[in-house]
Structure formats: structure tokens, C-alpha cells
Amino acid sequence: MQNNSYGYAVSVRVGGKEHRHWERYDIDSDFLIPADSFDFAIGRSGPEAAIPDLSGETCEVVIDGQTVMTGIIGSQRHGKSKGSRELSLSGRDLAGFLVDCSAPQLNVKGMTVLDAAKKLAAPWPQIKAVVLKAENNPALDKIDIEPGETVWQALTHIANSVGLHPWLEPDGTLVVGGADYSSPPVATLCWSRTDNRRNIERMDIEWDTDNRFSEVTFLAQSHGRSGDSAKHDLKWVYKDPTMTLHRPKTVVVSDADNLAALQKQAKKQLADWRLEGFTLTITVGGHKTRDGVLWQPGQRVHVIDDEHGIDAVFFLMGRRFMLSRMDGTQTELRLKEDGIWTPDAYPKKAEAARKRKGKRKGVSHKGKKGGKKQAETAVFE
């Protein structure tokens, strides 16, 4: 692992020109955040040549020759005072278009999820490719795109209806799909007061039960009975044997044509809630693994923490590259339980990841002894 240093060539590339030598930056990418973001700043001690207005320009954020984000500069700010100047640039990846703009009224019934995504992204030539990362490309049932919905909301709604999720790759490719849990861990991160392998600067462990429920009832109205809006003829119930508190919840699913479609959306929601139940946030020095690989969402990481008894592989949901005068270069890693997010994209690979042995690898099991296996697998079967 590289130590805190300024030993990285970090640039913002605009129109073939690279802007370098930044004093501070923050480059954040996360599957669960609709649009990734960047923020750069540099100061100077005196006057210099005027810099053109770059706001609205397409750019690439590049580290050591590798593109880590393609986006749009949303804001450019110049600060001036006696004897000093400061320039700052901030923006988001190309998902910003989809987050800000309203979706067209579009009938997607019968389209595949990939074709629907291509249709929604078509007005933006900056998004040069739309791809599927899943075993199947399912056809869609009737899905209502409500007036006022953004393109990203509509796209997420469509993807979630078949157990998938949208995101942008560093090169600007729009992806609909899920995690491939077959890739080997890119690094082992260790926290120990006695082990000289310790390579973690800071570690936060969070358990959260706010979205864990003892029983969840999912309801939907099949389209064949749409004339009776007061009744829901589709029902599926999930009981969590590990939740000892009485916490019942009812969820109404708007777009489900049959019980199988209802169950798929229900399982996606339950998986998302489970993800919220456990988060590891780790800060390391530098931006690369010991093997020289830049940290990137979608990687898998082996984490050992002797104090909390953690020894397991986790999924890297998000990462944040940072530079500051005080701390040098650092990377914040946001890790989640392996095999939980988008389990329907590659079902066998996700199941293998969930069954892999490990100590304290996710949410705590609050139920009686013996209920562990059922709790870990029931949501995904």
C-alpha cells in the first residue's frame, strides 16, 4: 500500500488538454449514489493568465493515465484576494444528465431491459454505449413512468423491476446489471494492534436495524384487475426469524403483473434493506492496492479486524479518492456484505459468495440459535 504522498499524476482532461498540479481534490464513486462527483482546487500566489470558462464541458478525470470518471464540469469558481488566486472545478459523471432531466412518456412493455435503457439514454450523445451486465436480458411487464419522474428514476424503476440496477462506468458507458461476485479479492486489509500487516489508517463499523423488519407483506394488483383499484390480488410475505423485535411492514408494489414479478421486486427491496444493515468504512493511504491497482467500486476486498473478530471478503460499493495538505493522498472505501446486492444478476455467483465462509461478514443475527442459515438464504431463494 502506498504511503500518504503526492506521488500520483492526477489530471482533469478537457478538449485534449490536461489540467494538473491540484492542491486538493475529492473524487467520489458509489453504486448507490445516482451521480458520481468530483471537486478539484488549486491556489496561486499571484496573477496568472486568464483561464477560459470550462463549465458545461465534457471532461475526464485521470489518475496515472487511467480514466476514473467521465463527466461534465458543472461549476468553475475563481477566487481572488491580494497576493493570492484560487481556481476550483466541480462536476458529476454523465449520470448527472439523467438525474436532472425529466423522463419522456414511454411505453416499455415488451421491451427488454437493455432496449428500454438505450431508449431512455438516446437523447445524450455523450453516453456512447449502453450495455447489460447480467446473465439474462428480461422482457419488461407494464411499467408506468409517472409525469415528473427523472430519467434516472425511470431507469432505476425499470432495472429494479427485474432485480437489476443502473450505473455509469469510468469511461461513460451506461450499465444495467449487477455485481459479478466471482472475481478474486484485490487486497487484504488488516486492523490489528499486534500484527505488523496493519495497513488501515481508519476503520468505522456500523450496524443498523432501522430497515430490518420481523415481517414484510408485499402487495400488488395484477393488471388484469386494474378496474378495481381498491383490491390487491397479489401477495407475498417474508418473515425474518432473526429479528426479535415486533416490526411488521406492508409495501405496495405498483408494477407487478404476476406473483413472480412481485417476488423479484420484493427480493430486490429486501436485499437493499439488508445492505443498509452493515457498513464497513475504511480509509487507506494512497489510491492503489499493494499490487498497483486503482481502487474501484465492484472490487472485492478481504478484511481482517482482530478486535471485532472480522475475517471475511466484502464487496466494495463505493470509493472516494482524496488529497489534502494535512493528510496527503487517501482513499475511503465503503464496503458491504458480499453477495447481497443485485443477487438476480448472476444468481449462482451471488449464492456462492453468500455461502463462502467468514467471520462477522455482515448483519448481526438477532434471532434464536439455529435460525441463522434460514435467515441468510430465505430472501434470495
Residues covered by each model-derived region:
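Structural motif
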Residues: 14, 63-64, 198
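Sec/Tat-exported extracytoplasmic proteins
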Residues: 124, 159-162, 166, 222, ...
